[in-house]
Amino acid sequence: LVLFLGLVSLSICEEEKRETEEEENDQEEDDKSEEKRFLSLLPSIVSGAVSLAKKLG
C-alpha cells in the first residue's frame, strides 16, 4: 500500500512538472500527447497496487 501511494504521488508530481513545462512552451499538441502518456500509465499503477494488495492480503 505504501509503495502504491508512493507511485501515485510520484506520478502526480511528474504530471505537474509536465504541465508546467507545457504551459511555458504553449504547445497544444504536446499537451495532448502528455495527457495520453499519463493516462496510459494509470493501468500499470493500478495493476501494481492490486498485485501488492493481494500479496499483503
Swiss-Prot record:
It is found in: Secreted. The modification Leucine amide is found at L56. Keywords: Amidation, Amphibian defense peptide, Antibiotic, Antimicrobial, Cleavage on pair of basic residues, Secreted, Signal. Its main location: secreted. Transmembrane segments: none annotated. InterPro entries: Frog_antimicrobial_propeptide. One of its GO terms (cellular component) is extracellular region. The keyword Signal applies. It comes from the Eukaryota. Residues 16-35 are annotated as: Disordered. Residues 21-32 have a biased composition (Acidic residues). Expressed by the skin glands. Residues 14-35 form a propeptide. GO terms for biological process: defense response to bacterium. Residues 1-13 form the signal peptide. Has antibacterial activity against the Gram-positive bacterium M.luteus ATCC 49732 (MIC=1.3 uM). Does not inhibit the growth of the fungus C.albicans. Belongs to the frog skin active peptide (FSAP) family. Phylloseptin subfamily. This is Phylloseptin-Az4. The gene is psn12.
